[in-house]
Every structure is written in C-alpha cells, then in structure tokens.
C-alpha cells in the first residue's frame, strides 16, 4: 500500500489500523497499546500513544518469540474484517485479479500472503505497567481455513 498523507486511525477495543509504509523495520522500543491482541501495520505506530498513558509497550525480538507461528481463527477473521473495512472505504488492493466484494479481496490477500497488516499479541503486563508483546507478520504465519 502506498504512503498516504492523511493517515486515518480507526480504533476500537481490539484494533488499531494504520497506513503501511513500504519498509517494515522492526525496532525494539517502548510503546503503548490496547489490552488484547491487536492488528497493526507497523510497531512504530504506537509511539504517539506512549505519552497518553503510563503504560509502556515492550516488543519481544523476532528470534525470542514464545507464541505459536499459526494465526488463530479469531486473528485471521479479524485481519479479514479490518482489511475488508479498509477496502470498502476505497483502499487499494494488493491483488491483480478482480474480486466482487471487499471480504473476498481481503481473504485472498490473506491466503496469498499479501495482506498489509501485522498482529500484535500481548504476552503479559508487568506490575510496573509494562506490556510485553510480540508483533507477527501474517506472511510468516500459518493461516487457518476460513469459510
């Protein structure tokens, strides 16, 4: 997805979505996020929220991850829903083939490993208020079948 000057942020209890940059540089840093697993496009997107809360976010390096590299059905469904919502409001597709609905496009992007989103999994929250998370790219994860 190309850079967009006016980055739209849609937030609810589970999701923060952002415009993806072409480079995906994962840097260990302290950032803040929601309490549940989230879908994000870049770890750096949380930096703006650090000042708004006393809680900080610690990202586990890729080589020290402890959770499974398989998407849960919930995560896969949520990825499709968020991406379909982006496409429904005139987001650009990552596919060359034409599909009839945003949901079909989002499913195909996920299964073709072209979906421009990341999954943030919360590992634990420390007594000091630090949230320890892993950030996964769905392109490197196993994908469950969705009906």
Swiss-Prot record:
Belongs to the archaeal RpoK/eukaryotic RPB6 RNA polymerase subunit family. GO terms for cellular component: DNA-directed RNA polymerase complex; host cell cytoplasm; virion component. Disulfide bonds: none annotated. The keyword Transcription applies. InterPro entries: DNA-dir_RNA_polK_14-18kDa_CS, Pol_omega/Rpo6/RPB6, RPB6/omega-like_sf, Rpo6/Rpb6. It comes from African swine fever virus (strain Badajoz 1971 Vero-adapted) (Ba71V). Component of the DNA-directed RNA polymerase (RNAP) that catalyzes the transcription in the cytoplasm of viral DNA into RNA using the four ribonucleoside triphosphates as substrates. GO terms for molecular function: DNA binding; DNA-directed RNA polymerase activity. This is DNA-directed RNA polymerase RPB6 homolog.
